């Protein structure tokens, strides 16, 4: 199943080049009162609601996917977790570019274990149609193409062997960053600097996430191209490690690291990202208001 949010927070299932409006499923979500529970209620209830969503999609008129504005498929993540320098060639390029690297001495980029995971503010999350807004045009804003995974149920201290059982699905992720000397989370949490989309492919449909080709172009120029098999720390280990530091909640997002080829974007650019077995999304770059 391919779950999306589109236009004015409508919910859809994507089938081929069309989507089917299943927004009525919101009536089946549990009623909540203040204080609102953390996490995304639709993602938490997805397995229970899935049969009815499929039935609603069967009855809905198809809408061309190209005609809608895609939001992030996850509306309410409690947190976005990032994995740094998770491709060896990206670490090598960071060693050569002081604006990318966070050094620990001897002029080398620190390893994942040395740096630890990092947190992006959930308020930075947008969908591809909303685009990226460059807030500091005098500084370098870089693209980082990544596989994003969405947690489907509460997870704490899970083993690597069981980790994938906690994944609701996968999406294309874009981890934007302003280069500089400030803390990484500070520079990666700017409004619109976390893009997720164009939809979430459920874990059962995508299958094994450890061998997916992906790429990113800017204005048609190839910038990044790699495969998830080249991750330094694989996905089960990332989930397990994160769950030993934080309780993972339904809707939480892990951006699993980027490959080599990161580079600057400017207002007016168009980024296009493709992931095997997920799809393609275009993300415009604009100047911030």
Question: Each predicted region: which residue ranges?
Answer:
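A generic local secondary-structure boundary/capping motif
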Residues: 1, 70-72, 105-108, 132-141, ...
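N-terminal non-catalytic cap/leader segment that marks the start of a structured domain
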Residues: 1-106, 111, 207, 215
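Short acidic-glycine loop/turn motifs at beta-strand connectors
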Residues: 7-8, 12-18, 151-153, 218-220, ...
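Catalytic-pocket segment enriched in acidic/His residues
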Residues: 47-54, 61-73, 86, 90, ...
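Residue-level recognition of short, solvent-exposed, well-ordered loop/turn junctions
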Residues: 75, 82, 127, 142, ...
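Hydrophobic alpha-helical segments and helix pairs
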Residues: 96-146
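Flexible glycine-rich active-site/ligand-binding loops centered on an Asp-His dyad
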Residues: 101-104, 109-113, 117-120, 162-191, ...
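Short, structured patches in soluble enzyme cores that scaffold and shape functional sites
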Residues: 120-122, 129, 136, 143-147, ...
């Amino acid at each position: 199943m391919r779950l999306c949010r589109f236009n004015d927070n409508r919910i859809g299932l994507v089938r081929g080049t069309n989507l089917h409006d299943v927004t009525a499923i919101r009536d089946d979500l549990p009623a909540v009162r203040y204080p609102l529970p953390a996490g995304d209620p639709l993602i938490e209830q997805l397995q229970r609601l899935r049969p009815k969503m499929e039935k609603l999609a069967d009855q809905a008129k198809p809408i061309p996917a190209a005609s809608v504005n895609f939001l992030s498929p996850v509306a309410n993540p409690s947190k976005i977790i990032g994995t740094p320098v998770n491709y060896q060639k990206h670490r090598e390029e960071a060693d050569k570019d002081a604006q990318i690297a966070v050094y620990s001495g001897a002029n080398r980029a620190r390893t994942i274990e040395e740096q630890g995971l990092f947190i992006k503010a959930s308020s930075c999350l947008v969908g591809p149609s909303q685009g990226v807004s460059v807030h500091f045009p005098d500084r370098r804003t870089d693209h980082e193409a990544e596989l994003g995974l969405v947690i489907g149920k509460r997870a704490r201290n899970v083993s690597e062997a069981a980790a994938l059982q906690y994944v609701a699905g996968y999406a294309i992720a874009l981890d934007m960053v302003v280069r500089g000397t400030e803390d990484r989370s500070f520079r990666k949490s700017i409004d619109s600097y976390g893009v997720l989309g164009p939809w979430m492919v459920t874990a059962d449909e995508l299958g094994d996430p450890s061998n997916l080709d992906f790429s990113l172009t800017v204005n048609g120029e190839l910038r990044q191209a790699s495969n998830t098999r080249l991750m330094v720390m694989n996905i089960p280990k990332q989930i397990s490690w994160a769950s030993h530091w934080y309780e993972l909640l339904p809707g939480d997002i892990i951006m699993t690291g980027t490959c080599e080829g990161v580079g600057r974007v400017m207002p007016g650019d168009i980024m296009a990202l493709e992931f095997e077995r997920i799809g393609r999304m275009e993300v415009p770059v604009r100047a911030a208001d």
